[in-house]
Every structure is written in C-alpha cells, then in structure tokens.
C-alpha cells in the first residue's frame, strides 16, 4: 500500500487525519526526535518535516532519526529542492498555485524530481494555496507571492479546482506557520463542496476546538506545528478533536459536514 493510500485509509476510518509538523530549524535533532515520539504517542497519524528557511544543515540527519524512532508515516513538507531525504516515506510534491512565481510553481520541482526518483521517494502531487492570515508569513516572504484574500472564497475555489484538474492528489490550504488567523471555515467548506480530492489545512490552528471546526467544514487532514512547540501536552486533545469518527467533540458549528 502506498503512503497516499494509507493516508486515505486513515481519513476514511477516523474521519480526518492528524499531522504534526516538525521544523528542523527550530530544534536540534534530539529535541525533534523527542517531539516526534510524543506526537506518535499522542495520536498523530503522520509527521510532516520541513522548513520555510532551512538554516540548519542537519535536515537529512533529522529525517533519518525521526524515521528510526516512529512507525507512523514520515512525509517531507519541503520549502525548496534542498529538502529531500532518502529516509522519508514520501514527499508532498508541492506546487504553489496561489502565486505566480514560476520558481515555486515548477522551478524547484524540476530540481527536486531527479533526487526523488533516485531515492525512491513516493511523490504526492499537492496544490499548495496560501490564504491570507492577517500578517505576512514566512512562506509568503520566501516565495515572494501574495496569498489569496481571506474574504474571496471564489478565488480559492477556482485555484483548488485547477489543482484537481492538473492531477494533484491533495489541496493544501495554508495560512502559514504561526499565522494570526487560520484558514476561514467558509473557504474550507465551499472548497470541499466543490472538489473531490482531499483537503489539508494548516496554519494558526491553536486549539482543539479550531481543529475540530476545520474537520467538520471539510478538512481531510489537519496540520499542527507551532502549538506543540509551545505546549506538547495537548496532542491527545487535538487527536480526539480531529478524529471525528472515533470521538464526539462537544463544539457545535454551522454547516460543512461533507460526505467522505
């Protein structure tokens, strides 16, 4: 079974999947391994490893050590073509469709593709859409692109539909690491109602209640990063909120309970 198929199986069984984002720039290798093990024990379904900057030279070492210490899928979430490691299970093969910078639409992908082939990594084509979150984010600055306005769901929907028609397997709605505000529920809901491929949502999700609402509005996978760098004791609460088929989380919301 491919990693992609395994992730879909997790989504179908649990209602949604729970990813923890690990940034090698923000902690050393022993610390990142410790957090990875806590994430697995806390109910994470997979680990994303990546950084907007990658100031550290220990990316490959970090991926290798994480993989050696956990059994859940380890998936690279690359900021550029340098973030490729033979030790991962798969890589989100991102194309930044919300921007018009050819470097991140296809340039980095061309550089990374031969390495992905050589390493035998499973590429998961993913349409990456930045959504306005209230303040400039690292990925916005590094990619030199503007996010989709948070009050323009039709623009987000058109980009997501284009991603599906281009053959992407996921759409990633991204508010940005440490975002002031997460992706709005109505954008998730309306996009989910329009497209047939799974939606990943990340950025600015600081509480289990927020995570739950993202799932109930159509997110198939939720990514949490900064919240655990500050307090890793709440991982299980996030897992219970995201795994809506296994737990009843008391947070009523409006709309968006898409069939899966």
Regions found by a protein language model. Name each.
Residues 1-22, 115-120, 124, 132:
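N-terminal amphipathic alpha-helix/helix-capping segment at the start of soluble metabolic enzymes
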Residues 16-32, 137-155, 201:
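Active-site mouth loops of central-metabolism enzymes
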Residues 18-22, 47-49, 74-76, 91-93, ...:
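Hydrophobic faces of well-ordered beta-strands that scaffold small-molecule active sites
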Residues 49-54, 95-104, 175, 204-205, ...:
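Glycine-rich phosphate-binding active-site loops on the catalytic face of alpha/beta enzymes
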Residues 80-93, 205-222:
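Catalytic cores of alpha/beta
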Residues 83-160, 164:
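Conserved anion-binding
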Residues 142-188, 229, 234-235:
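Glycine/Thr-rich beta-alpha phosphate-binding loop at enzyme active sites
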